[in-house]
Amino acid sequence: PVEVTIRGRIEFRHVWFAYENDDYILKDISFVIEPGEKVAFVGATGAGKSSILNLIGRYYDIQKGEILIDGVNIKDIDTDVLRSAIGQVQQDVFIFTGDIKSNISLGNENISMEEIKRAAQIVHADSFIEKMPGGYDAPVTERGSTLSAGQRQLLSFARTLAYQPSILVLDEATANIDTETESLITSALARLMEGRTTIMVAHRLSTIQHADKIIVMHHGQIKESGSHQELLAKNGLYKKLYDLQLVES
């Protein structure tokens, strides 16, 4: 495998993908994401959005086409190197039994206490950690039941940041947050994304309007792409999805 320092340029070239012997979930997908760009994938459930996220970390191999990271075929990059460059933030945050600091560093001894604290400060997690008895040494239990959903989310942002990834993958990262924490989370997310290639999947279109580019998926194909305003002006599928959500909310 090629030794690379990953900057975060991602390219899909005519990618076809299916799980096992199923029908194709992705059909002839091509796009380019430049380093530092924020790109969101939208579309109905089953459109293939989450599959794209799985393929970037090479959790599955594709049947046809190529996926390139910084111009190198993903198959030629050491999987550990590739995955350590990708920070994944998921909707269900797993909290381990231990203390706050080990939940940020995940026990990695290369991450110093100073780095743990800096990561927490950048994403505003320090605001609640420092109020806890024991602070960074405060004990937490497996389900993190002592923490609110918002606090768990901020902790997961700090965990992601401590590993200094060059690519961020956000799968519905702001789905289950109360309004009070939402502004804190939004601002923490913005700081987490700074200078990083970011790929987001979200069902709530309000969370992705500021993306540099939005790619609209439909039945495994790319139907349209552009900025929020460009897509509204096209009056196509994105506009339909957007109008539907306005009605629902």
Regions found by a protein language model. Name each.
Residues 3-249:
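ABC-type nucleotide-binding domain
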